[in-house]
């Protein structure tokens, strides 16, 4: 074969390969001409397995992690209670007691009005946690004032606990520098919670991938693409993820007489062996499962072992209030279903598997553990 023919055949082969690749990229899929994106790819599973969707919990439950901002409105709370009844939610804990304002008068009114409205019109269906205003930490006497307000909220107005937002460590600044979670000026507040016998639910940091490069290896790539404000940069002054977690743990260690509920399982739901070891180190630490059910639902065997071992320290929480999303939580905790969808793709592009917890453990997670550590809740609506 002449050199010219060889060259021609080689060229034709290259053209054929390129053509095949281009055709593969331009296959018409549905109404989409061209390559589909990761966001668009939503294959319908062909797997045929038993399905047991759950619209309500098997037992009445306490949602320890919820946020409501109009609980002073009787009509809106009445609608909320009807939704709670459909889910079998016996009691909701509103962690946003003081709302989002740093105006002291408005903050006080928000807390007092919603506690009074729910106590008067919907008794025993809600508990409200108070909050701390960190925006004035640089003012003289801030610590003493914050401790006094906390005590007043609990003793005289009926607040059942303290919620600390992730802004502490991520956003709260003094002289243009972030205030650490373990700032010593906050120590008297943690100690006061122990004296008052109320729990502190604390959200520190965010998922570790928020500190990692936004590339094809980042498991939270889609979330960071759609919520760019969640990306953290130590080069721009942010604490590292490891620093924030250590700051939080310093607080737990220093205040062993105070009960802490580590929100979102302390961002270790994807490393249950590590979380298990931390629960040995910090006997005053409980965890709740808000916004991390997707992590548990992809490791059903490991999750079940963890729940069996730590059944006395885990609480049910949801975080964002979207009634239709509770079904995923019920199904992961109660069923043994396989390969069912999660409700929010940017949180989890993988499928869920049920853990199949026993009734004994379900009762503890759903309500018994919360009744144990949140003071003054009505136990009559919950089975023994």
For each feature predicted by the language model, list its residue ranges:
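Bacterial Sec-dependent N-terminal signal peptides
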Residues: 1-25
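An N-terminally biased module of ancient metal coordination in phosphate/nucleic-acid-related enzymes
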Residues: 25-118, 146
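Active-site gating/metal-coordination segments in enzymes
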Residues: 28-33, 106-231
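Acidic (Asp/Glu)-rich catalytic clusters
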Residues: 53-55, 80-87, 112-125, 149-158, ...
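Hydrophobic faces of well-ordered beta-strands that scaffold small-molecule active sites
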Residues: 62-66, 91-94, 128-130, 160-164, ...
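Active-site beta-loop-alpha junctions enriched in small/polar residues
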Residues: 67, 97-98, 131-135, 165-167, ...
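Acidic-and-aromatic substrate-binding clefts and catalytic sites of carbohydrate-active enzymes
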Residues: 68-76, 98-111, 135-144, 172, ...
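H/E-rich (His + Asp/Glu) clusters that bind or coordinate divalent metals
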Residues: 236, 240-384
């Amino acid at each position: 074969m002449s050199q010219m023919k060889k060259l021609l055949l080689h060229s034709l082969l290259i053209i054929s390969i390129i053509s095949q690749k281009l055709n593969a990229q331009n296959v018409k899929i549905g109404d989409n001409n061209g390559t589909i994106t990761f966001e668009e790819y939503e294959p319908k599973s062909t797997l045929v397995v038993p399905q047991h969707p759950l619209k309500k919990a098997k037992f009445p439950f306490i949602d320890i992690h919820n946020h409501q901002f109009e609980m002073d409105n009787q009509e809106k709370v009445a609608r909320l209670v009807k939704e709670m009844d459909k889910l079998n939610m016996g009691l909701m804990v509103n962690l946003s007691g003081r709302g989002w304002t740093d105006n002291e008068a408005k903050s006080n009114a928000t807390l007092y009005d919603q506690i009074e409205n729910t106590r008067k019109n919907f008794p025993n269906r809600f508990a409200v946690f108070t909050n701390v205003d960190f925006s004035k930490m640089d003012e003289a006497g801030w610590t003493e004032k914050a401790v006094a307000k906390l005590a007043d909220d609990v003793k005289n107005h009926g607040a059942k606990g303290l919620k600390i937002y992730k802004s502490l460590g991520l956003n709260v600044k003094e002289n243009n520098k972030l205030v650490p979670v373990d700032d010593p000026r906050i120590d008297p507040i943690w100690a006061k919670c122990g004296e008052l016998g109320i729990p502190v639910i604390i959200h520190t940091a965010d998922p570790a991938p928020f500190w990692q490069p936004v590339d094809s290896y980042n498991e939270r790539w889609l979330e960071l693409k759609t919520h760019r404000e969640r990306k953290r940069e130590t080069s721009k002054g942010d604490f590292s993820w490891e620093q924030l977690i250590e700051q939080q743990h310093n607080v737990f260690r220093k205040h062993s007489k105070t009960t802490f509920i580590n929100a979102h399982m302390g961002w270790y739901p994807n490393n249950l062996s590590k979380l298990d070891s931390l629960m040995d180190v910090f006997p005053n630490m409980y965890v709740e499962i808000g916004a991390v059910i997707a992590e548990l639902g992809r490791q059903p065997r490991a999750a079940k072992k963890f729940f069996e071992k730590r059944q006395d320290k885990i609480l049910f929480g949801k975080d964002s209030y979207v009634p239709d999303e509770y079904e995923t939580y019920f199904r992961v905790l109660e069923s043994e279903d396989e390969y069912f969808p999660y409700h929010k793709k940017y949180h989890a592009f993988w499928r869920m598997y049920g853990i199949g917890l026993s009734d004994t453990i379900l009762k503890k997670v759903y309500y018994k553990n919360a009744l144990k550590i949140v003071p003054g809740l009505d136990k009559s609506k919950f089975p023994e």
